[in-house]
Amino acid sequence: MSTRAGRRVAISAGSLAVLLGALDTYVVVTIMRDIMHDVGIPVNQMQRITWIVTMYLLGYIAAMPLLSRASDRFGRKLLLQVSLAGFAIGSVMTALAGQFGDFHMLIAGRTIQGVASGALLPITLALGADLWAQRNRAGVLGGIGAAQELGSVLGPLYGIFIVWLFSDWRYVFWINIPLTAIAMLMIQVSLSAHDRGDELEKVDVVGGVLLAIALGLVVIGLYNPQPDSKQVLPSYGVPVLVGGIVATVAFAVWERCARTRLIDPAGVHIRPFLSALGASVAAGAALMVTLVNVELFGQGVLGMDQTQAAGLLVWFLIALPIGAVLGGWGATKAGDRTMTFVGLLITAGGYWLISHWPVDLLNYRRSIFGLFSVPTMYADLLVAGLGLGLVIGPLSSATLRVVPTAQHGIASAAVVVARMTGMLIGVAALTAWGLYRFNQILAGLSTAVPPDATLIERAAAVADQAKRAYTMMYSDIFMITAIVCVIGALLGLLISSRKEHASEPKVPE
């Protein structure tokens, strides 16, 4: 195989791997009910199923910086093959967990999948940088990034499609096995085993472990296995969260003092870099809150089945890529800062509208400039999705502009890590607070039931009360999400202008 053909095969295989990892990040949000049924989780303990999302994200975030650096030391080919093998093993465990009804195996499988997926994006980005000259590199790296973003758009729809095709959610994970095998074969025949530099890169193991510990403690501290109306956190929540804060401080101190760091700050413009990452955290939190809670609103409040509720997300997911295209074009005219600010403000407006959804939402429509009307839920989700899409390109572009060229791979990964961190903490925090708020609202509602009411009438009254409590809970969650987006928009004002670029660090002769 020629060098040119070999590198195209290699980068295609890497992009396929990135797409698989991205799909599996989001695929479970539309098949949660089926998974809950097969692993024995009752509907009134829905908070337990969020672990299949949080543990995947935690593994993803913890593995990404460590394994991307490890590929500098041990070679792209070896780390890609190991990561793909791990992804296949995690997929098998997840599918078998459904077969045996084993919740703990399910969580273990998703965690292994997350760790493996966390390595695929940065290593493939680094591989693209290795195989293409700098002048031709932007298009290649953009294609890899597009595979990641495509997964976020298609993931929920992919889950619905596979379940419709095979009538079994386990095939979502079984189908990963042949696809992973194809990617591994393509990498095996297209890459040399000696694909690392002469100088072995050091790996910041301590920094990676501290970051993983900090995020893990925060997630555990926020998770309340027995939510009620009296307290948001479990009895052990506060000391565990304090431990997470201590680990975060230790991580920051280590990264400041260590010789080997996850990201070398030399030449990086810190303020705009951190501001762009902060805005990415806000965007990630909003994205995951939408993917999880819109479907639950459809099922719990509107009485839809799983497929109908997941169909609500189609409007949001259609708007995302449209917004991404418009955001990329708009950033070339108005700049990344303006597009990020405007995009997140539009997103905040969308969530403000969603926070006002009533119990009888299906009866409401919105007038579009007096010309025609569309169902309110579709219009509001389109606004939120369009706004989030607008910031995808500008945030990545703004981050790369203030980082030296040599660190573009790890900087691109940092944007994804920031977004994933927002998703992880957002779903953990709002799930904990939302369930507390639901029980609090439910305890405060009173339903007048006649003393001579039948059992069916009493059950209907209780169901109506729960539906009202759910509506009020989701209203609060989406209002908080709108506030998070406003904070992200303000951070967007601090990102770099088009004239601000990183200074390349001097290399000693």
UniProtKB/Swiss-Prot annotation:
GO terms for molecular function: transmembrane transporter activity. It is found in: Cell inner membrane. It holds the Pfam family MFS_1. Disulfide bonds: none annotated. Keywords: Cell inner membrane, Cell membrane, Membrane, Transmembrane, Transmembrane helix, Transport. GO terms for cellular component: plasma membrane. InterPro entries: MFS, MFS_dom, MFS_trans_sf, Sugar_transporter_CS. Its main location: membrane. The chain crosses the membrane at residues 48-68, 78-98, 112-132, 146-166, 171-191, 203-223, 232-252, 272-292, 309-329, 339-359, 381-403, 410-430, 477-497. The keyword Amino-acid biosynthesis does not apply. This is Probable triacylglyceride transporter ML0556. In association with lipoprotein LprG probably transports triacylglycerides (TAG) across the inner cell membrane into the periplasm; TAG probably regulates lipid metabolism and growth regulation. May be an efflux transporter and involved in maintaining correct cell wall permeability. Probably required with LprG for normal surface localization of lipoarabinomannan (LAM). It comes from the Bacteria. Belongs to the major facilitator superfamily. It is a multi-pass membrane protein. Bacterial LAM blocks host cell phagosome-lysosome fusion and is one way in which Mycobacteria evade the host immune system. The keyword Transport applies.
